[in-house]
Swiss-Prot record:
Homology family: Belongs to the TRAFAC class OBG-HflX-like GTPase superfamily. OBG GTPase family.
Subcellular location: Cytoplasm
GO cellular component: cytoplasm
Location (main, coarse): cytoplasm
Class of the enzyme per the UniProt entry, highest EC level: hydrolase
Function: An essential GTPase which binds GTP, GDP and possibly (p)ppGpp with moderate affinity, with high nucleotide exchange rates and a fairly low GTP hydrolysis rate. Plays a role in control of the cell cycle, stress response, ribosome biogenesis and in those bacteria that undergo differentiation, in morphogenesis control.
GO biological process: one example: ribosome biogenesis
Gene: obg
Protein's name according to its UniProt entry: GTPase Obg
Residues the record lists as binding Mg(2+): 172, 192
Amino acid sequence: MFIDSVKITLASGDGGKGAVSFRREKHVPLGGPDGGDGGNGGDIIFVCDNNTHTLVNFKGKRELRAQNGAGGMGRNKNGKKGENLELIVPEGTQVIDAQTNEILLDLTEEGQRELFLKGGKGGLGNTHFKHATNQRPDYAQPGIKGESRLVRLELKLIADVGLVGFPNVGKSTLISVVSNAKPEIANYEFTTLTPKLGLVDVNEYNSFVMADIPGIIEGASGGKGLGLAFLKHIERTSFLLFVLDPMRQMPLKEQFIVLRKELEKFSNELFGRKFGIMISKSDSVRLGEEFAEQIALNINELDNYLKEINNPQSFLIKVSSLEKTGLKELKFMLLEEIKTLRNNKKNFNNLGSVLY
């Protein structure tokens, strides 16, 4: 089951209370204080793990708490620290304050560990309060309460390439033939109800991650269809591949315009992201000469529109996932784009290090 949003209360452990205790030995009727300190409460720690792909482990849980610290004991024995609670989450998980919507943590890298809530400090035992005017203190500190916070965990998939298109345009078929992903494929809209990630091996040394996002429809940015729930997953893809279907009644140019508008309404940053265009189902030209001519005009109209708007797209390619034509070229084109983006990011990070 794919779960990408949960609301939950997280609480670190309370500190254990300090002990009130006195030495009890033969021939020492009024032994001094020997109360130990309480143990600190356990912490809440988030751990990012790329073997985890969903937030399903948090489904149905209203609260998770770290262990409380144990109380102090006599003979100056300190209480045991409460066990930390480590929460394993997938890459791309954000921890958001449920009241203010403030992003508290952003977990994006394998192995990333973040202390979220610190456990309460254990109280001091009565040994600490002995002084010249009070040799037998009969009080100790209570432990400090742990922290508690109501949060929302949101998963935004991280991928190199995100597939953007209307329902049933061939996105799932494409990712099934170029990667290790096995999405459900059928001839009806909204076959893909959850995002899918696939690893695309281009050659022995190069690969990238592709995300199949459920189909976008007009009005998605306002919540129509599967709407906002899945548009957010495109946010963390480095490169967008628009998948357009020549078999739809809507012309290719109009498909592209509508999809771009939905992205623009959702996020200006996403709208400005670099992208390519893939015309799917190129084998449909076999349906007849007249149909093939219509598709050619359709593609030409799209191409002219892109030139009119000085479009920054990197490439336009025709592909048939069923006949496996154009797939090799597509993979290499995408790889070149990803390499360029990775190098640009690396150079930017290096520049930042030098400036710092």
